[in-house]
Structures are given as C-alpha cells and as structure tokens.
Amino acid sequence: MAEWVFKQGALSLAEMTNLPAGFRKRLAGEAVVGRLEVLDSRVSAAGDTVKYLLGLDDGHAVETVLMRHDYGRTVCVSSQVGCRMACRFCASALGGWIRNLRSGELYEQVLAVRRASGEPVTHVVLMGMGEPLDNYENTLKFVANVTAPYGLRLSQRRITLSTCGLVPEIQKLARERLALTLAISLHAPNNALRDTLVPVNRKYPLEQLIPACAEYARRTGRRVSFEYILLGGVNDSPELARELSDLLTGLLGHVNLIPANPVPESGYRAPSPEAVRTFRRVLEEGGVPVSLRRELGADIGAACGQLRRRHRTKAVEE
C-alpha cells in the first residue's frame, strides 16, 4: 500500500489492483487516499517555473512551485498554512498562521506537481509557505517517505530544508545525522537589524544560531547555506557585507544572495545592481563562498518571499 500511495501516486483504493478486492472494499469504509486539488496554475513568461494553488480538505489552500533547471526538476514544498515567524519581507506571514500541514499533505504536493506536469521530480526544497522546523515531526516524516524505497527514492542530498533559525530544532536535526542541506534565512549580520527583519532572532539571537549551524555542519559534514535577501537601502551596504564576512569566517558555509522580490505590502525594494555587485565582492574578498541566486518565477509571484496563504473559496476568483 505504501508503494501505491508514495511511489505510484494512486488516487483511489480501486487502483491498488494487487490487493484483494475484499480487503480494498473493507478498507474503503475506513480510509481515504488523500489528494490535493489543483485549483489554479500559472506559468512564468520564461516557461521555467509553474506555481500551483492546491486546495486542502478544510477549505484552505497552499502554493507549491515547480522549477525547471538544467540539472532536473525541483518542487518547492509548503509546510504550513500561513506562518507565525512574521518575517517583515515575506508574504507567507501575511494573515498569520492557521495550521501545520500533515506529512501526507507535504508529500501530496510533490505528487500533485508530478501529475500535473508529467515530469519526474529530482529535487525538493522545503522553502514554501511556513517554517518547516515549526512543523518538525511532519517534516521529518515527509523526508523519510520521499527518500524511502517505497517512495520516490530521492537522495537526502537533493533535499534542502530552510529555517529562519529555530535553534533547538536545528540542534535536534543535527543529531538526526541526515544528509539534508540546511538553509538559514539569515538576512542580517547583527542582532539589531535581524531583530527587525526576522523577529524570531529576539528569541534565538546570532550568538545561539551560528554555533548551532556550526554543530550541524560538524555532525553531518554538510555545508550550511545562508540565505540573504538584499533589501535596497536596508541590509545591502558594504559595511554590512564586512560584518557578514566576519560572522561566517571559519564556518563550513556558503552565502546565497537574493535580490528582493516584489511584495507590495512589505514596503521594501530591490537593491541596485551596483549594490549587489559590491556586496558580493566584499564577501569574496573576505574569503566567504558566495553565489547570486538566479530567481525563477518572480513575474507570477512564485519567487522567494512571494508565496502566500489563500482561502480555497477565494482562490479561484484571484
């Protein structure tokens, strides 16, 4: 049964033809093979990104994204309906948190995208709506299923888990000794600025977060990715780049620079191209590995910080 659900993506018990008919009939009265309904889909102008609006059985909906790369197909999975982290530049926090997604709802996002696109999924990033480590147990169950022999058999190394910095859960994840790529939504090199942009920093400041990241890298042997959204005139100065370089010196890590994507409600703007070049150069001069993310899907609201909670009954109208 697990193989039918997790690998074949069966939509009903009737499809599980190698199970006895009587057993399937009895089971039908006690269980339902869940599936998320595709309410809407939007394709970017470049054709490399598709955003799906998936309806849940309680009337809410989540956004899931397919990204087409030269090296494969990546699905960006949401972990919660809404988010309670309240990052100032992120649309997912608008309207607050409703509930955690069940592990099956995380998995079904991957299957729904595979069905709708007809393309095999090679990578997963837990970077959609919500904070994955605020839904720890369901997130780890999802990882176990998507990497299992009865599932899609994805390599753990092809899964990236993003967090804004829940230190106890990062430490717990490190003890799991999984080969996941940990991505930290950093966005500021000091507590004063990060307290404003990423409010969870007030509970888990950089003095706790950075050692937790170092522990994760040490226990897993995996390089930690530090995501840094560049907000024009806010966190994109050369001085802050030098602070960031000092903060990460000696850590097995990598900085991923992301020019801010439009979220009208946030009031933030993208940095100038010159500010991006200078920020990157300062990090490189400091010996910090750095890359500039090629953003996909900004024109359809599918890029970093743009996914948001919607209600199923209103989604189709939008």
UniProtKB/Swiss-Prot annotation:
Disulfide bond sites: 76-304
InterPro entries the UniProt entry points to: Aldolase_TIM, Methyltransferase_A, RNA_MTrfase_RlmN, rRNA_lsu_MTrfase_RlmN/Cfr, rSAM
Cofactor dependence: [4Fe-4S] cluster
GO cellular component, one term: cytoplasm
Subcellular localization: Cytoplasm
SUPFAM superfamilies cross-referenced by the UniProt entry: Radical SAM enzymes
Active site (catalytic residues): 63, 304
Record's keyword terms, sorted: 4Fe-4S, Cytoplasm, Disulfide bond, Iron, Iron-sulfur, Metal-binding, Methyltransferase, rRNA processing, S-adenosyl-L-methionine, Transferase, tRNA processing
Cofactor binding remark: Binds 1 [4Fe-4S] cluster. The cluster is coordinated with 3 cysteines and an exchangeable S-adenosyl-L-methionine.
Enzyme nomenclature, EC number: 2.1.1.192
Pfam family for this entry, one: Radical_SAM
Gene3D superfamilies per record: 1.10.150.530, Aldolase class I (3.20.20.70)
The keyword Repressor belongs to this UniProt entry's keyword annotation: no
Keyword presence, Mitochondrion: no
Reaction(s) this enzyme catalyzes, per UniProt: adenosine(2503) in 23S rRNA + 2 reduced [2Fe-2S]-[ferredoxin] + 2 S-adenosyl-L-methionine = 2-methyladenosine(2503) in 23S rRNA + 5'-deoxyadenosine + L-methionine + 2 oxidized [2Fe-2S]-[ferredoxin] + S-adenosyl-L-homocysteine; adenosine(37) in tRNA + 2 reduced [2Fe-2S]-[ferredoxin] + 2 S-adenosyl-L-methionine = 2-methyladenosine(37) in tRNA + 5'-deoxyadenosine + L-methionine + 2 oxidized [2Fe-2S]-[ferredoxin] + S-adenosyl-L-homocysteine
Chain residues that bind [4Fe-4S] cluster: 83, 87, 90
Domain Radical SAM core intervals: 69-299
Protein family according to the UniProt entry: Belongs to the radical SAM superfamily. RlmN family.
Function: Specifically methylates position 2 of adenine 2503 in 23S rRNA and position 2 of adenine 37 in tRNAs.
Name of the protein in its database record: Probable dual-specificity RNA methyltransferase RlmN
Organism: Desulforudis audaxviator (strain MP104C)
Lineage: Bacteria, Bacillati, Bacillota, Clostridia, Thermoanaerobacterales
Gene this chain is encoded by: rlmN
